[in-house]
């Protein structure tokens, strides 16, 4: 049996150009990000979107932020669920609306920039820039330009970093636990 003190654990990022290149978000706090990317299969589940929306609620992103739901089901849930992962009631904002209000660019579900693609791919890095992303790989050229630097992080860390324009520990923006209801539970 292993016991972990989750309160003592720090959010991690993977520096370019390998998922194994681990560091804490705190140690990377001076890294400016030109773009934030939330989504694809790894960071595009409905719970990921709920976490990001709770960080971004009532705020505006500083770094251009691209959101790609991991499936059409997640996209539909983003439109129909509130920030607690429950069915949206009249007058409540949906996860989608919250992300949109924060200034995020929301695309269709799919891989999008996670695997680069042609120059017009949604969220693709077409020039050397620094991106913080919820995707699962950060090898040179993976999200587009071979000289782009991609940091991998959780949806919470990516959302917090989108707000500040630099890699940011999301605990600065979370004051209470984020509930996801039964969202994402099959």
Regions found by a protein language model. Name each.
Residues 1-186:
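Fe-S-dependent hydro-lyases/dehydratases of central metabolism
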């Amino acid at each position: 049996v292993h016991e972990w003190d989750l309160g003592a654990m720090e959010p991690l990022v993977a520096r370019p150009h390998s998922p194994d290149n681990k560091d804490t978000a705190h140690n990377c706090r001076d890294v400016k990000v030109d773009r934030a990317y939330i989504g694809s299969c790894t960071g595009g589940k409905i719970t990921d979107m709920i976490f990001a929306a709770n960080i971004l609620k009532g705020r505006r992103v500083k770094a251009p932020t691209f959101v790609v739901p991991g499936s059409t089901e997640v996209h539909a849930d983003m439109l129909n669920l509130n920030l607690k992962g429950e069915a949206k009631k009249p007058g409540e904002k949906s996860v989608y609306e919250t992300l949109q209000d924060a200034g995020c660019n929301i695309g269709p579900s799919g891989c999008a920039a996670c695997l680069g693609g042609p120059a017009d791919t949604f969220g693709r890095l077409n020039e050397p820039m620094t991106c913080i992303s919820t995707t699962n790989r950060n090898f040179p050229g993976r999200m587009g330009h071979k000289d782009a630097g991609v940091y991998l992080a959780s949806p919470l860390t990516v959302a917090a970093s989108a707000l500040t324009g630099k890699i940011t520990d999301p605990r600065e923006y979370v004051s209470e636990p984020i509930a996801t209801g039964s969202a994402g539970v099959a």
